Amino acid sequence: MHGLVKRLLLWSVGHPLWAAALFVALSTLAALQLPRLEIDESNEGLMLERDPARLYYDQVTATFGSDELTMVMVKGDIFTAPALEVIQRISESLAGLQGVTRVDSVATVDNISAADDGLEIATLLHDGIPTDPAGLARLREKALANPVFVGNLVSADGRAAVILAFTAPPAGDKTFNVRFSKQVDDVVARESRPGLTIYQIGGPLIKRTVGEYVERDQVTLIPYSVLTLFIVLMIGFRTPQGVVAPLFTGVSSALWGVGLMAFFHIPMNVVTVSVPSLVLVVGFAEAVHIISAYHRCLRAGLTKIPALTEAVEEAGLPILVTTATTVLGFGTLIFSDITILIQFGYAASLALTANFVATLLGIPLLLRIWPTPKRLRESAGEASVAGTALEARIERGCDFILRHRIPIGATFAALTVASLWGWYSVKVDTDFVSYFPESSPIRQRMQDVDRTLAGASAFFVVVDTGRDNGVADPATMKQIAGIQQFLESVPGIGKTVSIVDYVSQLHLTFTGAPGAPRTVPDSPDVVAQHLLLMDRAQTARFIDLPARSANILVRHSLTGSWELSRALRQLEQYVAQNVRGVQVQSAGQAILTNRAADYMAVNSVTSFAYTLAVIGLIHSALFMSVKAGLLSLIPNVVPVILSFGVMGLLDIPLSTGTAMVATIAIGITVDDTVHNMVTYSRQLNEHLDERTAVMRTMVIQFRPIVFISMALAAGFGVMAFSHFVPTVHLALLSVFVMIAAMMSELVLSPILMASTRLVTVWDLMRIRMNAELLRRAPLLTGLSRWEARKVVLTGVLQSMAPGEYAIRRGDLDRQLYMVVSGRMVVIDADLDGIERTLAIVEPGGVFGETGMVGDGYRTFSARAEAATDVLRLDFAALERLRKRFPFTAAKVFRNLATILSERLQDTTTALLYLSSGSDKPRT
């Protein structure tokens, strides 16, 4: 491992006291930030940050008022004196609360009806609440005859009524939703009585409940995750050290991550609530790699410090690369335009960076001060029967996979293609209410309102005429009426209210008989007169002051952005075909969320592509091969595509929660791929045979892959206990991805690795290549130091003790040797057995090259005169060099041809001397 990085990774091993002090200091600083952590229960994070529709929405609400409403449902016999008194008192109480801009109920909204002296425009209760049955019956008749009331404020059967409180929270007041919804609860509690069912539902209560659920998830998910990982670690390591160390760094990583969220003012919301559990699980996985390598070194007979040093060196590179790819992968989310995903991208990237520091600081520190486990100390140097049997089964399985690589690859390809169809069928659906389970009080109340009245949700449809008094034009009025009639025919839309309802009701009162249809006057002057008769406070929500624009309030029970988007498309088609001379545009928080959902559908693909590109570039740089970089993506891409196929098959929507499954999955599963490929590179350098290297890699990595994958699946499974439906979906999909990734790593990776030769940048940096050797070595003539390192890593570096033979006469050996350091002597023996020195080979010198191109039987011996390092190359190694680094290989082949030419010339000269009887020595 390169000097600086190696020193950083091993710093805590050599400086345990300083490392412990630093760890405690960082943990303390993180803990001190926790009180500053913000809980964001709003739905603004679900919207696009730079959406032009957001500016339009602000303009609409400034003109017609807020669409943020709280409903107080009253169920029972509404047209009785006690019930009407309750409705009146609740209306008055809500109107007195801070932030309330308007209250609509049967007690506050004007009713238009005929009177003995002509026309009456007043609230139903303006003369007080009648106590006699006849008076109550007349009140009921008036209310149920008014289209503004029926379905909007009172049910058609008179058994339910609702009080609508529209709110506009003070700017910057983050406690409004909690405070206001609790104040409404107090009002409801005061008015509760036998015979009436009273409850509230609406934006403030929903947002308050979100905040409460976020806090509950923090209280439940993290302990459940710790308990799950504790059980998994006990099964896997069976030592206190193997249990405590990963949990310690995992919990510390979660603490540091949350502390960083608080420090950078990243709130805890319905999406970022999963970050602590995520980093806890990921931190556990990285710790397991180091501890597994450490225990393997102890079993091999190394003492504590050498074992720990080797383990950190072995696992450090994959952990560093995995962290870089994972952080950059999650970092792609910050380029999203959805606030909640941007916040998750920052939070996850910061937390995973903290996890890297905590792992490489905490794990070596704990292992350094922890006594060597007795079980490992006693079994040092011994191979267990069970372990040997498992290795044999792994090798047989790997052999089977390599022999049947084509049908296995075809099976994975077929599943992937089928899953692409499933991905295509995934629907985009995000909605704040859909975050709650069907059994939750929020969903139950919403459904009750939907069944009883016109729906618990609302949005606006604004008709802009572009001219003053344009709304007073009867033609415009009739077009608005047509839009309302169409909307009420769309499934899920229960009621629309506009200025047309007021005008037509007033016109009917003047001109029509009871029961006659309501129509808009044909005369603009009559329409204008009707508008003047109305109370501006009552109609301000439906028409602006210059009568330039009209607002249609749409009450609906549409669930999620999918249904809303379909309804809006139908509205657009109707407007395009039937409406002329005006502009029609929808507005509302639900509309903004819907636009974000459409954006998210595209962003899920682009974010996935960006993540793949980042990982591919890093791996291509690490293994110095675009081919290797692309191959490394396949075991990670396949599980993600399969997960989207499952989403399509099970009709799981793409929401703000599940949209992250691709980024999370590929960010985590890449860990096993990096460990696999780095191990394969090292095994290939040792064995020089792809098949053998693949088998040894799988023997080494099988346990960590299976163990970590199952642990990750269990850890993500804990998130299924979340109170939020998208988090539950994310958990279940992540469990599937972890298992699919495990199968991909165990089955696909061996096939892919066997098809390529891997050399890592880290390996090249490890090779020492001084300028003197480059100058003296004829095989390396014209090569840069970097290219020379590639050549060295293509072959095998062999260390030889003094007196050790590299070649013996008569051996079958087709390798070329280059002395890297030390000295070799090439010797022969005459007929009398007397040894003769044929040549002394110094660093940079080459011997054995003719055996590589000839029949391979050696005619001389080569022995080390001192401690010597030699580089061994055969034709297979040169062929690998040609495929991986063709320009470097061309220089090596040129140099080899030059060396062989010189050897041929030397041999010819020597033969001439011998034939002439000269005794000139051979060199």
Show the residue positions of the predicted features.
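Hydrophobic, glycine/alanine-rich multi-pass transmembrane helices and their short helix-loop junctions
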Residues: 232, 261, 320-363, 368, ...
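Regulatory nucleotide-sensing modules
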Residues: 775-847
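Extracytoplasmic
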Residues: 62, 129-239, 478-481, 526-612
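Cyclic-nucleotide recognition modules
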Residues: 787, 837-894
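Interfacial helix-loop-helix hairpins and adjacent transmembrane helices
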Residues: 1-23, 309, 357-416, 685, ...
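Solvent-exposed, non-transmembrane loop/terminal regulatory segments of multi-pass membrane proteins
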Residues: 19, 34-85, 130-154, 398-402, ...
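Interfacial segments of transmembrane alpha-helices in multi-pass membrane proteins
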Residues: 215-268, 335-339, 606-652, 721
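Pore- and gate-forming transmembrane helices of large, multi-pass membrane proteins
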Residues: 220, 247, 286, 299-336, ...
